[in-house]
Amino acid sequence: MKNQLFIYNTLTGRKELFQSLYPKRVGLYVCGPTVYGDPHLGHARPAITFDILFRYLMHLNYKVRYVRNITDVGHLTSDSDLGEDKIARKARLEDLEPMEVVQHYLNLYHKTMDALNVLPPSIEPHASAHIIEQIQLIKEILEKGYAYESKGSVYFDVEKYNKKYNYGKLSGQNIADMLNTTRKLDGQEGKRNPIDFALWKKASSKHIMQWISPWSNGFPGWHLECTTMSRKYLGNLFDIHGGGMDLIFPHHECEIAQKVASTGYEGVKYWMHNNMVTVNGQKMGKSSNNFINLEQLFNGTNPLLIQSYNPMTVRFFILQSHYRNTIDFSNKALQASKKGLSRLLEANNNIKQLTAQTTNSTVNIEGLRNKSIEAMNDDLNTPIIISYLFEATRIVNSALAKQTQLTTEDIQQLKDFFQLFLFNLLGIKDELKYKNTSYNSFAKAVDLLLQIRVQAKQEKNWIFADKIRDELTVLGFEVKDTKNGFEWKLSK
């Protein structure tokens, strides 16, 4: 079977065969968070999406340099060139230093990403640590004639750029329409056109974060950092740039313009974008009173939640939808994910109970594996892989019920199948095992109690046997008598 990965390229609007620029090496850049608030579902989705890509590329034996930036300067409250810096505003409101705000929310972000079992990137550069490089990039764009200085700020000349290149190539935006529909706003009087975007902004005396530049004391525009840092760590040409669909315009469109203006070429071979998260059918946002951060999800403290959901349930919920589809959060959907994941983990843990009953296989685990690889190669189709995991679960349950006979090879292939797809590639952790380092001792203690119960039943000491079962039930254990003795599991 050919193992060829196809990914959807936003730039071309079609799935394309992935071919790395350099043999067995991949450069991957993903836009990370602006760290001024609690990490939420909108942060989890791109992190998990590109974690899956990172894991699979490594599985395919690529050496991956994965760069995910941290925005800690330049992202204004309007998401364009107006308003206050989001981090500076938070610092002012809470009477903190800006880097205190950054460190606090970055720690929270790392904590939640670790809980979601998101692998750390190879490099996690901060925008504020690359001011010199950003100033150098501005100089290059000015020298090429695609930017202009105005009142201490520097703006990218979109109209001039578009005469030679195509501004809007990634997003499908038409510059003529933008020029006709974009009104001139207060605070943009230094621009030649309202659609021009800032490369450098002159700071007011009250602006907390500002640096010395050839044009003024100020700060870089939001779009500049990713062009600068991707170039520094991955070179002028690299394989994949990822992020949320909300970044296609203007952020990623502006990144392309900056790269082309400074170097003459686009610099990225594949653009990948994950879709958005909605809550009960509505866009998530504080103004809609449907904002749920990840800590609230994990501890159940948001009023929209009827219970808490552990991080692996949240990860599994996100992976049940293809990354390019919108995913709608609801308690009903999370509860279904919790139940489904529990079935898969239980089946995996039950494989150890299986024994070979035949030498002639009646199941095709290798076929499931091949179809799952095909699904991964088809633009990371995780929902299809999950459907095959449920198919493997049915085989395990059928074998436990003595309705299907398995060979020794079948049993090993089932173990390998769950290990590769559920744990290695989808990144699920069996939380029952990892939550408590003394799990094995705990399980042995339960087994010992149930062995004592079996002995009590053999001695017809029914009251004592029932007491053990009833007490375990109260503690959250589900006990089932079998022909071979007993089975148990945690029911809550």
Curated annotation (Swiss-Prot):
A single GO cellular-component term on record: cytosol
Enzyme class: ligase
Residue ranges that the Swiss-Prot or TrEMBL entry lists as coiled coil: none
Residues spanning the membrane: none
MF-aspect GO terms: ATP binding; cysteine-tRNA ligase activity; zinc ion binding
Top-level taxon of the source organism: Bacteria
Record-given protein name: Cysteine--tRNA ligase
Natural source organism: Azobacteroides pseudotrichonymphae genomovar. CFP2
Lineage: Bacteria, Pseudomonadati, Bacteroidota, Bacteroidia, Bacteroidales
